[in-house]
Amino acid sequence: MQKPWVEKYRPETLPEVVGHHEIIKRLTNYVEKKSMPHLLFSGSPGVGKTTAALALAKDLYGDTWRENFLELNSSDERGIDVIRTKVKDFARTKPIGDAPFKVIFLDESDALTSDAQNALRRTMEKYSDICRFILSCNYPSKIIPPIQSRCAIFRFSPLKTEDLVENLKDISEKETLTLEKGGIDAIIYVSEGDMRKAINVLQTAAAVSDTVTEEIVYKVASKARPDEIKKMTQLALNGKFVEAREQLYNLMIDWGMSGEDILIQVFREVPNLDISEKEKVHLVEAIGECDFRIVEGSNERIQLSALLAKMGILE
């Protein structure tokens, strides 16, 4: 059975990691010196935090990396018992081979409860001689200050377009795919700097056709073309509510888009609209209100229709 491409083409070493050149340079220095502090990786999903941690471990330990590296997903195991058992049991044992210390990687550590984070802080202090921690999170503000102060913080930004394009072209060549310019642009648009999402969309599109086109990408990603969102928005702004709502229903039914997906795309289109700054502010407020109501459980079609109606009377 074929592996997911995100795993098949995951970089094995730090020099292979795409983008984040300054971060990779600092991590490589840690490997060369065989010395590092506790680390905190923050950034949105799919930007390379887990890949960097795994590559660091493989470069640091070589063949014994599995014995000296423990990976836990804190969103699945977020309670204090995990810190008291799995983490502590691994941290208290000496490293295998000539490794100076072990590494524990806590992915999505911002999901840890407050009690679990306090227990983790004590564990980090107690076993600092033989163990280092790498914490990965989407929201560093959810990590308690005592842990943040014990870590060197690395902020992973969304990947640049050129890095995404280079990697997508490389994978397409290895998989003997024809990647059209429109297909690349569409993947860049739907992925928003998320390499994991970009590769997953590419693999899904490749299952449909060996030639990856713009139309296929938007279809498999359940996203609308930016011009379709712009058309719907412009109709609403011009007071053509019925036509705008018809376009909305086409997106939801024909493309299978959720209300949240449509809202996000409308929000991304706001800066490009030919309306005043004041109207853009009011529109963003209306989008935020619509998003809140949908999250609270309101009917998506009704709320999005109400948003389109508000667009026609913006002041």
Curated annotation (Swiss-Prot):
Keyword flag NADP: no
Cysteines engaged in disulfide bonds, as pairs: none
SMART domains registered for this protein in UniProt: AAA (SM00382)
GO molecular-function term, one example from the UniProt record: DNA binding
Pfam families for the chain: AAA, RCF1-5-like_lid, Rep_fac_C
UniProt keyword Nucleotide-binding, yes or no: yes
Annotated binding of ATP, by residue: G43, S44, P45, G46, V47, G48, K49, T50
GO-annotated cellular components: DNA replication factor C complex
Keywords noted in UniProt: ATP-binding, DNA replication, Nucleotide-binding
UniProt GO BP: DNA repair; DNA-templated DNA replication
InterPro entries named among the record's database cross-references: AAA+_ATPase (IPR003593), ATPase_AAA_core (IPR003959), DNA_pol3_clamp-load_cplx_C (IPR008921), DNA_Rep/Repair_Clamp_Loader (IPR050238), P-loop_NTPase (IPR027417), Rep_factor-C_ssu_arc (IPR023748), Rep_factorC_C (IPR013748), RFC_lid (IPR047854)
Top-rank lineage group of the source organism: Archaea
Family note: Belongs to the activator 1 small subunits family. RfcS subfamily.
Subunit structure: Heteromultimer composed of small subunits (RfcS) and large subunits (RfcL).
Cited function: Part of the RFC clamp loader complex which loads the PCNA sliding clamp onto DNA.
Protein name from the UniProt record: Replication factor C small subunit
Origin species: Methanococcus maripaludis (strain C6 / ATCC BAA-1332)
Gene: rfcS
